[in-house]
Amino acid sequence: MQEMNLLPTPESPVTRQEKMATVWDEAEQDGIGEEVLKMSTEEIVQRTRLLDSEIKIMKSEVLRVTHELQAMKDKIKENSEKIKVNKTLPYLVSNVIELLDVDPNDQEEDGANIDLDSQRKGKCAVIKTSTRQTYFLPVIGLVDAEKLKPGDLVGVNKDSYLILETLPTEYDSRVKAMEVDERPTEQYSDIGGLDKQIQELVEAIVLPMNHKEKFENLGIQPPKGVLMYGPPGTGKTLLARACAAQTKATFLKLAGPQLVQMFIGDGAKLVRDAFALAKEKAPSIIFIDELDAIGTKRFDSEKAGDREVQRTMLELLNQLDGFQPNTQVKVIAATNRVDILDPALLRSGRLDRKIEFPMPNEEARARIMQIHSRKMNVSPDVNYEELARCTDDFNGAQCKAVCVEAGMIALRRGATELTHEDYMEGILEVQAKKKANLQYYA
């Protein structure tokens, strides 16, 4: 009976199905697909041999790609060294004359000589060097062709003439000196009696730069420039300095006599360079003081100097309303002889806003003297209204001169503060100089 119990008992169908299910679950967990489980032993061996051969092929491919990668790295290193040698200074300065699109469509016959440079597709360039030689470059060089345009200044290799680097735009050194690096310290509060003029200047110059969207919402075009005119000493240049101090724009100060040059075309080139520099550093303001030096009415003259001044003014007219208007460049011009200016300068579209600076009235004169006396040690008994009544026909500069003369008189007598009598004596001093000047010019 014990031997009979040692014999294996046949498994039931339920137990066999459970084992098969367990095997399938383990196969799925190991990543073995159902297709492999249904394959025979010979098929599995054959599949394994195929996979081994594919692995060998992939390993050889990886080895080949690794060798190619190393060869490419060596080639890149070699080319980098060649570029470094070619980029050694000095460069030959050249100008880009023209950019050409090259796309050869004609097919060469079999056996014909083929010029590889002529078969390149893309951009080619024509340059003119500083030695006055013109070259055609089938290959531009190290600079992207999309970043080049005719007229650009570039540095090329002196042997191969390949473009190695773009150079900054060349401007006249006199134009660069026109840029105001240090901001003036004047403020609108330092100007007395010109509230209306300050408002007109802010509306025409400052507002279009700081709040451009207001003009776009209304659909109006802001003024291109402002002409400030009036007698000498009424605050035209002072207001321009205050405008330069209050805005963050680049400020270029030109003097009219500075644009009158001896050589033909030199003054016009200064005007072109000044506007080009202003466009590059936009937003910017160009202030032209003493505009009557170049803006006089045109007339027939046989003198070369007069014709050169007229050519300079024509270039200024062209820049004011050229073919490409620029709303980020504003022009402020000042003169005390508006009657002799050319009508072409005064028409709308060039200097749209005309701001008159009259002689200050009594209230304005009192305000001007108060402003210039703020930092002085002044006695409380000084009556500025009475001083303003005594300074009839005085401009702003003469009112300032009264304060300076009063301070000098107080200094002469060793006083520690300025009195009303000092101001009255200062008025007499300025009036005496004024009469002397009138008699001198008469």
UniProtKB/Swiss-Prot annotation:
One Pfam family of this chain: Prot_ATP_ID_OB_C
Keywords per UniProt: ATP-binding, Cytoplasm, Nucleotide-binding, Nucleus, Phosphoprotein, Proteasome
GO cellular component: nucleus; P-body; proteasome accessory complex
Cell location: Cytoplasm; Nucleus
UniProt GO molecular function: ATP binding; ATP hydrolysis activity; identical protein binding
Binding locations of ATP: 230-237
Keyword Nucleotide-binding: yes
Modified residues (Phosphoserine): 12, 379
Entry superkingdom: Eukaryota
Cell cycle among keywords: no
GO biological process: blastocyst development; modulation by host of viral transcription; positive regulation of transcription by RNA polymerase II
Stored Gene3D superfamilies: 1.10.8.60, Nucleic acid-binding proteins, P-loop containing nucleotide triphosphate hydrolases
Function: Component of the 26S proteasome, a multiprotein complex involved in the ATP-dependent degradation of ubiquitinated proteins. This complex plays a key role in the maintenance of protein homeostasis by removing misfolded or damaged proteins, which could impair cellular functions, and by removing proteins whose functions are no longer required. Therefore, the proteasome participates in numerous cellular processes, including cell cycle progression, apoptosis, or DNA damage repair.
Entry's family note: Belongs to the AAA ATPase family.
Record's subunit section: Component of the 19S proteasome regulatory particle complex. The 26S proteasome consists of a 20S core particle (CP) and two 19S regulatory subunits (RP). The regulatory particle is made of a lid composed of 9 subunits, a base containing 6 ATPases including PSMC3 and few additional components. Interacts with PAAF1.
Protein's recorded name: 26S proteasome regulatory subunit 6A
Gene: Psmc3
